[in-house]
Swiss-Prot record:
Gene3D superfamilies: Glycogen Phosphorylase B (3.40.50.2000)
Gene, per the UniProt record: Ugt2b1
Family, similarity comment: Belongs to the UDP-glycosyltransferase family.
Induction: By phenobarbital.
Signal peptide segment: 1-23
Residues carrying a glycan: 134, 316
Keywords assigned by UniProt, alphabetized: Endoplasmic reticulum, Glycoprotein, Glycosyltransferase, Membrane, Signal, Transferase, Transmembrane, Transmembrane helix
Subcellular location: Endoplasmic reticulum membrane
Example GO biological process: cellular response to glucocorticoid stimulus
Protein species of origin: Rattus norvegicus (Rat)
EC number: 2.4.1.17
Name this polypeptide is given: UDP-glucuronosyltransferase 2B1
Amino acid sequence: MSMKQTSVFLLIQLICYFRPGACGKVLVWPTEYSHWINIKIILNELAQRGHEVTVLVSSASILIEPTKESSINFEIYSVPLSKSDLEYSFAKWIDEWTRDFETLSIWTYYSKMQKVFNEYSDVVENLCKALIWNKSLMKKLQGSQFDVILADAVGPCGELLAELLKTPLVYSLRFCPGYRCEKFSGGLPLPPSYVPVVLSELSDRMTFVERVKNMLQMLYFDFWFQPFKEKSWSQFYSDVLGRPTTLTEMMGKADIWLIRTFWDLEFPHPFLPNFDFVGGLHCKPAKPLPREMEEFVQSSGEHGVVVFSLGSMVKNLTEEKANVVASALAQIPQKVVWRFDGKKPDTLGSNTRLYKWIPQNDLLGHPKTKAFVAHGGTNGIYEAIYHGIPIVGIPLFADQPDNINHMVAKGAAVRVDFSILSTTGLLTALKIVMNDPSYKENAMRLSRIHHDQPVKPLDRAVFWIEYVMRHKGAKHLRSTLHDLSWFQYHSLDVIGFLLLCVVGVVFIITKFCLFCCRKTANMGKKKKE
């Protein structure tokens, strides 16, 4: 730290000392890749505000690298696998998920996805067990008296830590497959009549056939698909706590859910007071580019630049795919900045420059950038929205197809399927996005929506974490639906009671009418006699 930074940090600590409750202790259960990139931004902001932040890091962590210079504390715990083991697993899952997924039937695709999630669940459970069974570390954590736990909901264990340490819990989440966690643990009402099931790749304007498809997928996710091995996790949690419980029940105790999206990307749907959108919290104004890159961008003249990146998890393309992409890029008048780590394609044009890493946000914010060719990861999508850049989407896995389809529905993107990627198809998509002004106009419209918020997403995320610390939880924001059984939630008991009342009234009226009829008939007979 510089002298100036040290002085500011000491000043904050003094403020915390004289204002008890102004600063607190935050324990973090993170996950890898873009999830860590997002949550790290929140942690840095919390640390700058004087909070003591502690991150739990496994010895096999891929991106989370503890540094002495950081204002964040790191607690490293040993796990029975190495960093290379974890990297291999992620690479294998990505390969299995992306291999020809567009050509598979929807049920075969979901079957493959379930297999990937089962294996992922096993790995995360092993990481969690290594932490929970580390008695010395758990004793240290219990003695630290944390004010809040911040956890990524796609990696279970944060809810168990919150229960063991008797600490409020805040989730950071993009989504669970089929909205399973949000619905069953968070209690979020998501009617399938107009809310497309996440991963369904549908929009909110569905035809009858699409609503049938949406309903079937909702039933599949609700009653069959499991993002985590529910039975295994529930048994583990029950053994640790010494009482019967379930993963769904434990996750349902979260105080606040910070969802990494916003109404610029998301379709309208019901919300609850303990949910809030913080999509794009990592976005910021563009900084100057490195000198060499700036010179290349400026050399594009009036044609401008296209930015190409398939994210951090996809290291390179096959040689065949790389040549297909390079051939298409070589035929456009724009200069191209391509994030690529592999053998130089034979068809690479003179207008294209390869980089192992690019300052993506700064490039997207450059006035000469005309389009963004991307895989559709949420971070990249939000950087494009922030700067108002139209997208050519080549989705690969996870939330990417859904994200790209949302942008297509909003008129700010064109989708190209990876499995049938061709030079002609990519070239056509690029020309459409850059030559049709409606794509730029729609991208700018989404950008205006994103910027028109009373509080910035990052400040909102920090506010809710501090809110939970100040109030020692936020149970007053949780709906009482968590205390209802499924038949009470759907009012089946009330409907049954009312139906019984109606049947009873009809029965009594019928009996009364029959009685009156018989009475009248008997009186008639007596008069005749």
